[in-house]
C-alpha cells in the first residue's frame, strides 16, 4: 500500500495519565496510531508519544480528538533552594502538567509493506 503526497505525520506528546483515553478515541475514529513510551525533560514524567499518519484533510480532526482527551492540570512538585553554604530547604511548587504538544510534518513517501 502506498500513500500519495497529501499525507501528514503527527507527533503528539501526551501525559501517561491521558494516553489511554487519547489512544482509545483515535482508534475508535479509525486512525492508526503507534505509541512510544517517552520521558519529559523538565519533570522527568512519563509521557506517551503518538505517531499518527493521516490524510492532510484529517489533521484537524486528529488534533481535536487529542485536545479533547488530554487536559491540562496543576500538580505540586518538590523544589529546593539554598539559604546558606551547604544548607538547602525543600518546598512544593505548583506547575502545569498535561495537555499535549503536537507537531505536524509532511510525508514525502509512505509505504505499508
Language-model regions, residue ranges each:
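Positively charged, small/polar-rich N-terminal and surface patches that mediate targeting and assembly
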Residues: 2-113
